[in-house]
């Protein structure tokens, strides 16, 4: 007896809808943008970075999580698009069992979790750079590595917990959908991601303001003042990243909460008409390397411009000191 289960008519209708096809094509754009900008972001992080070595470890971990999500998401998106365009006239479109999708889903969810936890890890490392005295290279490297490993471990633990005791006896069209018995936990996960993104945003603002407030309490010695300026620049970059991440996660979790709460009073077609556009993690993943690349390049260009002004302008000693002070603002 065949154990194959075929897609229902409603699922096939969703696959062949113009809304679905447009969404699947558009969502591949941020996926490929992520791959391209990750390459350039890693290059500028290595060569022109405003970040310490410990922060670089965490940035690499964030790049890894973002690209892990995008690779797995792209595979399933292309597969669904292929089915939508070329296989819907077949007598049976076989569904996958939840059990055979288990490992794929766990790795996929760990990519999403890694993007959120990675931001928290970056802030924790920035807090260490701010409040720990003598935060020199060896100490910062150990801190960065410890936080990176912890983030990766927590990411995979989270994905396992979501489907911990799920019987996985159902069927689904794609391996990036949560099993039917784990839907409630997936909703909790979405809410936690949003709250954690909000926490990251508030924390990053507080750390940035603290460093800005005490910037000039550091004696005007090039080494200490430069490190203080480095902390301010890197923290403001992370602050901007967390703001973008929070907005996307708010749309993701709040949007799904609303449509799930009214699912009983709207049709299957209308539910998925909206749902396909509410999944924002591909855009979160794409924004990360883009913003890192932009912020590092703009900071580097600003420093070069200031140096050129120093070297090309004749000044008195007092004017030179004042200009140097302004450069650190």
From Swiss-Prot:
One Gene Ontology term from the biological process aspect of the record: detection of chemical stimulus involved in sensory perception
GO molecular-function term, one example from the UniProt record: G protein-coupled receptor activity
Signal peptide (residue range): none
Cellular localisation: Membrane
Pfam families xref list: 7TM_GPCR_Sra
Membrane topology qualifier: Multi-pass membrane protein
Membrane-crossing residue ranges in chain numbering: 25-45, 103-123, 144-164, 188-208, 238-258, 273-293
Main location per the UniProt record: membrane
Keyword DNA-binding: no
InterPro entries per the UniProt record, alphabetical: 7TM_GPCR_serpentine_rcpt_Sra (IPR000344), Nematode_rcpt-like_serp_alpha (IPR051080)
Keyword tags: Membrane, Transmembrane, Transmembrane helix
UniProt GO cellular component terms: membrane
Protein family per UniProt: Belongs to the nematode receptor-like protein sra family.
Name listed for the protein in its UniProt record: Serpentine receptor class alpha-4
Lineage: Eukaryota, Metazoa, Ecdysozoa, Nematoda, Chromadorea
